[in-house]
Amino acid sequence: MSRFALVGDVGGTNARLALCCLDTGSLEAVQSYPGQQFDSLESVIRTYLQAQAVSVTSACIAIACPITGDRVAMTNHSWAFSISAMQRSLGLAHLSVINDFTAVSMAVPVLPAESLLQLGGQTVQPDRPIAIYGAGTGLGVAHLIRAGERWISLPGEGGHVDFATGSDEEDALLAALRTDLGRVSAERVLSGPGLVNLYRAVARVAGRTPQPLTPQEVSERALADHCPDCRRALSLFCVMMGRFGGNLALNMGTFGGVYIAGGIVPRFLAFFRDSGFRQAFEDKGRFKAYLAPIPVFLIVHDNPGLLGAGAYLRQHLGARL
C-alpha cells in the first residue's frame, strides 16, 4: 500500500495542502485555503487533515519566508510558529519546513516536460547549476545544484537585492520609486504589488496622477490597451524580469536552465512571450554570447511548490529523484 505524507505551499494569500505519495511523488487531494480566514497555519493543517481519510506521520511545508531556525515568522502574513512545537502538537514523526522557493527548485527535477514552456536559449546542460525565480505576492529566488545522486537547493532572499536599472527611463522611474519607498529592492517592482508600483511611477514621471489600481486591474487594462501607463508598466515588468533572470544566470553560470515560477506571468503569457524579456535577459554587454545559449523555462504546472515539497521530503527520506 502506498504511503502518504502531508505537503504544503504557504504564501502570503493562500495555503495549499495536499497528500503526496511517498512511492511515486504524485499529489492527491489538493486543497487551497485563504490564509486570512485562519488564525494559524496549524489550524489550516488540522482542518485539512480532518477532511482526509488517510493518516500521515511525515510532512513538508514550504513557506514564503526565510527559514533560519526553529522559529518561523512569515514575511507577508501575520502567522508565526515554532517548528518543533507544531510537530509535537500534530503528532508527526517528521516535519520539514522549507522556504517556498526551495520547494519550487526541488520540483524542477521531477516536473513533466508538458509543464515547461521554453523561452529561448538552447538545450539544458546536464548537471550544471539551475536558477529559479518567480513573481507573486513577493519575488522568490533559489538555485539548485546536483551533488552525486542528490539535488541540493540553495535558498536565499535574492528578491530583496537592490533594483538595478538599465536605461535612462528606468533611472527616472527608480527616482520616483525611491521618493515613495526609500530603498528599492527588486521585489518592489517584480511582484504583484511591484507592478502597481511600476504603474504609479510611470504615470508620475509622465506628469499624470495614478489611479488606485490593483495588480489585476493594471494587467487587464494593459492587455486591453485601455491605459497607456498600464501597458508601459507591464512592458517594463517583462523587461525587468528578463534583466533580473540574466543576473541570476551570470551569478552561477546556470547552463542547467533558468526557470520562472509564480502566479503573475501566466496571466499574460502571450504578452510576455512577445515582450522584450529575452532581449533583456541576454543584454549583458560583453557577456551576451555567454547568456545566449542558456534556456529559460516558464513553469506552467499548477502546483510546483507542492510537487517540490514532496520531492524534498522523499529525497530526505531516502528516495532518489
Curated annotation (Swiss-Prot):
A GO term for molecular function: glucokinase activity
EC number: 2.7.1.2
Keyword annotations of the record: ATP-binding, Cytoplasm, Glycolysis, Kinase, Nucleotide-binding, Transferase
Principal place of residence: cytoplasm
Chain positions recorded as ATP binding sites: 8-13
Entry GO terms, CC: cytosol
Subcellular location: Cytoplasm
Reactions the enzyme catalyzes: D-glucose + ATP = D-glucose 6-phosphate + ADP + H(+)
Biological process annotations from GO: glycolytic process
Family: Belongs to the bacterial glucokinase family.
PANTHER family to which the protein is assigned, alphabetical: GLUCOKINASE (PTHR47690:SF1)
The protein's name: Glucokinase
UniProt source species: Edwardsiella ictaluri (strain 93-146)
